């Protein structure tokens, strides 16, 4: 499945997804975000059971504030509309998958 671009307009439908949700809060100018992006894309392609979305913190400041995002990249895992895991900084694929399983 492809990565969804998340914004204020489509966030509620993403939040209420039946599937676990992986959110990648990023900025275009952020070097570590560019390093993490292919890993997130790979997870989206490999895992049909997970909804993967990216949120540009410069365009969606309100969503970033709502999640307490102060640094990029930040990964958030949601299940049943609730945050179950959150992590700032670049993470290896195995650690991201562990966040999703936790």
Go through the PLM ranges and name each one.
Residues 67-76:
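Structural micro-motif
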Residues 18-19, 26-29, 71:
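Short pre-active-site segment immediately N-terminal to redox-active cysteine/selenocysteine motifs
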Residues 2, 26, 51-53:
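Conserved Rossmann-like nucleotide-binding pocket used by diverse enzymes
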Residues 76-102:
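Non-catalytic, surface beta->alpha helical segment in thiol-disulfide oxidoreductase systems
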Residues 18-20, 37-55, 59-61:
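Conserved helix-turn-beta segment immediately C-terminal to the redox Cys motif
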Residues 25-39:
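Conserved redox-active cysteine motifs that mediate thiol-disulfide chemistry
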Residues 3-20, 61:
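A short beta-strand-turn-helix
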